[in-house]
């Protein structure tokens, strides 16, 4: 996968993170339609590395006008099984916002990844970054479990496994 890029070049994950950052800077707030438009513009260019799921969502005709509806439709068409991690890599920038981190991370994730497991992972990582930047301390294990369970209880067992020092248990 990585061999398609020159050393030091960024991937689709960084491109999409920049779509989020550019929209926030331009609008001076989180405007989901603006972010969706940036995603669509990027996808209609040369979106090297774009995943199949993200491609499918962004290439539905009325995506920009109804991004949540389109994202949910593609997820439902998969039998509610698609839970890829594409939303996670790009929403980390949301953790740098001073307020509304959880809502913004959840909403931005849902622009392309509607599955609640995807949403929870984006919220957890964004909240972790926010906590480290603004309080210099990470979220507690209990806080992470609480966030996960608010979105999808299936995540709890993976949070439990993360306490183990052996990555093979995951």
Over which residues does each language-model region extend?
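Structured, active/binding-site neighborhoods that engage oxygen-rich ligands
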Residues: 1-170
């Amino acid at each position: 996968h990585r061999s398609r890029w020159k050393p030091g070049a960024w991937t689709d994950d960084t491109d999409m993170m920049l779509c989020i950052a550019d929209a926030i800077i331009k609008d001076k707030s989180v405007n989901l339609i603006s972010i969706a438009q940036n995603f669509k513009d990027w996808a209609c260019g040369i979106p090297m590395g774009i995943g199949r799921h993200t491609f499918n969502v962004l290439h539905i005709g009325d995506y920009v006008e109804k991004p949540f509806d389109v994202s949910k439709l593609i997820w439902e068409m998969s039998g509610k099984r698609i839970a890829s991690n594409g939303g996670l890599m790009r929403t980390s920038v949301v953790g740098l916002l001073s307020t509304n981190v959880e809502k913004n991370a959840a909403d931005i994730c849902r622009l392309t990844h509607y599955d609640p497991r995807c949403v929870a992972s984006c919220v957890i990582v964004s909240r972790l970054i926010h906590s480290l930047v603004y309080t210099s301390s990470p979220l507690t294990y209990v806080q992470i479990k609480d966030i996960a369970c608010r979105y999808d209880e299936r995540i709890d067992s993976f949070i439990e496994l993360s306490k183990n020092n052996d990555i093979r248990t995951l």
